[in-house]
């Protein structure tokens, strides 16, 4: 009886094994036919960097280079495999934009298991999700093409090297788009003269990194509420800390913004009017800035001037309803206006009735190198404002000027004025921003340009003409624009007024008031930065 059972079991297992083998062969044959059909699209493809996929209904384009291989496309013209670690922003498929970030893993899983129904379902979920890009007007007729990430074995020295981003290019995506562009973007959004308006409200703010500020959603939301409440026409942001776009020498010939090397990466050419997006790390910041400009400041045109690295740099935003007549990124009128300061410290815009200069003036520091750098900048400012005065050009100079003109602009004047490191000349003793040398240069700048410190002017005017008005002296009052970021320690509660609106005397009668937005040792209305916004209101 046991032997019979054993024979039956043996026969059953053998038959089951035979059936499994047949099924397995059918499975492989079926998949080989599918794979072989897909390979037919490559039979007559010529060698070269551009090839044409003639699969089914007209096909779609894809590129091939030494660092990538061909990726098969399904009936929809979409590669089944989406790299989960690749830098994929938007993928344009005619009028549809596919959002891939949240569905990459499930999409890949469906493809690997050859579950066509599941793949179809995922695709239907993806299509229809719309992601705004930095240029709404840009449309592409290409289908979705993705180059799969792969290891690089042989690299041509002439090829661009940019990590996985260079290996995962998306046709019609962010690779060909740049944040910035200045007047080129302004012209695209140009309004008829009769609907254009004048500048009424200007805000200056040292952000101490635009991406860091944005990541704190609660504080950023409060900042945007403030911007919308005052209905700012122009926003001048300093220290945005975004690297400039690096470009090849051939590309630099076609770039409007002149480029040249900085302290780091000497000789590497940059487009200082655009944000870097050529590697994974920079692409993260690029996407944040794109989102800010597209969602929060969609009614504004942006003008960038950036350094080589995440240091310094500026962004000026102007409402599209206001005409910008010209833009300059240096202080020398005899030179090309598109030559930038190599640390992005200067943006000069011309409006109908005045020029607006936004600067992130160099910190004086505590050593001879920094002293010379600040002195050189101040000397350029002396010549610039003198030229503006002689040409009868009204000027509003704003930004983080890194100067406290008087002791009243210091929370602890005695301590600030004694600070030093090592043996330095007497005129450089003191906290950077309040040394005798800096103050002397600042006074000369005001004199040469016939300029006025507008905040101090209006404060003194109130004290002189309004008996009920008393000068604010409390550490918690809104009289300082910079406050020490530390709430404990030797420097806690220290504060200075170093962000300004310096204006031509001819413009004083057009200004309503100057307001320092932040206050308190707890940094109220500083929105995460060590500086607070300052507001200039023009008379309407």
Swiss-Prot record:
EC number: 3.1.11.2
Cofactor annotation comment: Probably binds two magnesium or manganese ions per subunit.
Compartment(s) of residence: Mitochondrion
Function text: Multifunctional protein that plays a central role in mitochondrial DNA base excision repair pathway induced by oxidative stress. Has apurinic/apyrimidinic (AP) endonuclease activity towards double-stranded DNA (dsDNA). Has nucleotide incision repair (NIR) activity; acts on dsDNA with oxidized bases thymine glycol and 5,6-dihydro-2'-deoxyuridine. Has 3'-5' exonuclease; can use dsDNA templates with 3'-OH termini including blunt-end, gapped and mismatched 3'-recessed.
Pfam families with a match to the protein in the record: Exo_endo_phos (PF03372)
Gene Ontology MF terms in the entry: DNA-(apurinic or apyrimidinic site) endonuclease activity; double-stranded DNA 3'-5' DNA exonuclease activity; endonuclease activity; metal ion binding; phosphoric diester hydrolase activity
Organism, scientific name: Plasmodium berghei (strain Anka)
Record's keyword terms, sorted: DNA damage, DNA repair, Endonuclease, Exonuclease, Hydrolase, Magnesium, Manganese, Metal-binding, Mitochondrion, Nuclease, Transit peptide
Needed co-factor(s): Mg(2+); Mn(2+)
InterPro entries to which the protein is assigned, alphabetical: AP_endonuc_1, Endo/exonu/phosph_ase_sf, Endo/exonuclease/phosphatase
Lineage: Eukaryota, Sar, Alveolata, Apicomplexa, Aconoidasida
One GO biological process term: base-excision repair
Broadest EC class assigned to this enzyme: hydrolase
Phenotype upon loss of function: Normal growth of blood-stage parasites. Developmental stages in the mosquito vector are normal with no difference in oocyst numbers and salivary gland sporozoites. C57BL/6 mice infected with knockout sporozoites have a 2-day delay in the appearance of blood-stage infection and have reduced parasitemia. Formation and release of merosomes from infected mouse hepatocytes are normal. However, merosome infectivity towards host erythrocytes is partially impaired resulting in a delay in the appearance of blood stage infection.
Name the record gives this protein: DNA-(apurinic or apyrimidinic site) endonuclease
Post-translational modification: May be proteolytically cleaved.
